[in-house]
UniProtKB/Swiss-Prot annotation:
Protein name: Avenin-like a5
Lineage, broadest ranks: Eukaryota, Viridiplantae, Streptophyta, Embryophyta, Tracheophyta
Signal peptide: 1-19
Listed PANTHER family: AVENIN-LIKE A4 (PTHR33454:SF4), PROLAMIN PPROL 14P (PTHR33454)
A Pfam family the protein falls into: Gliadin
Keywords from the UniProt entry: Disulfide bond, Seed storage protein, Signal, Storage protein
Function: Seed storage protein. Not integrated in the gluten polymer through disulfide bonds, unless incorporated by reduction and reoxidation during dough making. Increases dough strength and bread volume, but decreases dough stability when added into a base wheat flour.
Phosphoprotein found in the keyword field: no
Amino acid sequence: MKTMLILALIALAATSVVAQLDTTCSQGYGQCQQQPQQQVNTCSALLQQCSPTPYVQSQMWQASGCQLMRQQCCQPLAQISEQARCHAVCGVAQVIMRQQQGQSFGQPQQQQGQSFSQPQQQVPIEIRRMVLQTLPSMCNVNIPQYCTTTPCSTITQTPYNVPMATTCVGGTC
């Protein structure tokens, strides 16, 4: 019964994905610069539920749900800079850490829209290592080398979340 409750809470967290961003186009260049709002994303749920060795084991998760989460996580991740991916990796690790703490102490899961940009404590190395080893291969993206050595508390000084794709046409977004 407790396992079902935990799985239901994780599924709820995975479906409450909101990715908002303010978009501005730089003058004269017609390029978009994305300034993402801090929101919960699906990458942590993807890693927890769908990786070959998920951090939270789930035998009830369906492949179709994993495919949808993979698209929602990986497509935007592939469209951002490598530096921004480093921020995203730390953000995902923060979400997983907080969800694990909530499960361990019987507290509710992270609420939609809750910030993970100002960590209350350092992300455990095993969670960060799991994210760094799994997310790039699942999404077929490169993560900069400094992400493996720079602490997340330093990297996440600027809030970051994987944004939804934005297109610009003729300098207008």
